[in-house]
Design a protein with these regions (language model features):
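Acidic/His-rich segments in extracytoplasmic proteins that coordinate ligands and/or metal ions
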Residues: 1-48, 134-153
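Soluble non-cytosolic domains of exported or imported proteins
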Residues: 13-17, 38-45, 59-62, 66, ...
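Loop/turn elements at helix/coil->beta-strand transitions in domains of secreted/extracellular proteins
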Residues: 3-6, 26-31, 51, 82-88, ...
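Extracytoplasmic/secreted envelope proteins and their assembly/folding machinery
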Residues: 17-20, 45-52, 61-65, 69-72, ...
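His/Asp/Glu-enriched short active-site or ligand-binding loop at hydrolase and phosphoryl-transfer sites
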Residues: 107-127, 147, 177-180
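Structured C-terminal subdomain patch of bacterial secreted/periplasmic proteins
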Residues: 38-56, 60-62, 67, 145-187
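Basic- and aromatic-lined ligand-binding clefts that recognize polyanionic substrates
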Residues: 60-114
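Second-shell loop/turn segments in exported
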Residues: 6-10, 32-38, 49-62, 94-101, ...
Length: 187
């Protein structure tokens, strides 16, 4: 039988998805982690300090965060004078709709800080914007890179989901990247 000291969860604001009311009702201690609402990449990383506090590891978290900030700023400086940024788009379609990160999202900020030209930087907001597949194909067909495609282990898996993915130049050139390093050493 489990008897946790604390359960960390997130809250969406939608009763059908949130588990914390039931957990609290069951007498369990709950803390809400809202890191996913943070649009600044370093702000998201700083939530590690919040988690560290529950383990009395604040000093270690502060040190790691400070090192991360320094590395991040160094990386930004490396591309700050880039004259021809690469073009990039993100994500994949889900049930026929492509949820593209808004131009103020942490994904858009990460790409800009990396010296990339995010094809959808003009989308309003920090959340994902629903787009038709055809709209994405029209705007991103010639993009240099495609990131954040999910937990794919091989490129051909994308085409197995939707053959239209093969129409993207990034797919044809093999410049498609997942966010999961757990799959291969290169991500």
């Amino acid at each position: 039988e489990l008897n946790p000291d604390l359960i960390m969860t997130s809250a969406s604001g939608f009763a059908e998805y949130d588990s914390h009311p039931q957990l609290l009702e069951a007498g369990l201690s709950v803390v809400i982690n809202s890191d996913y609402l943070e649009y600044d990449p370093l702000g998201r990383a700083e939530w590690g300090k919040f988690i560290a506090a529950f383990f009395d590891k604040e000093a270690e978290a502060d040190k790691l965060f400070d090192e991360m900030v320094a590395r991040y700023e160094e990386a930004k400086a490396l591309v700050s004078n880039q004259t021809e940024p690469v073009t990039v788009f993100a994500n994949t379609a889900y049930e026929g709709t492509w949820y593209m990160p808004g131009g103020e999202s942490y994904i858009a900020i990460l790409l800009a800080d990396a010296g990339a030209d995010y094809v959808f930087k003009d989308l309003e907001g920090s959340g994902a914007q629903p787009l038709d597949f055809e709209v994405v194909l029209e705007r991103a067909k010639d993009a240099d890179f495609w990131v954040n495609v999910g937990a794919m282990t091989e490129l051909k898996e994308l085409a197995g989901i939707d053959a239209r993915y093969e129409d993207f130049e990034a797919y044809q050139q093999g410049k498609v990247y997942t966010y999961s390093k757990r799959i291969t050493a290169a991500g």
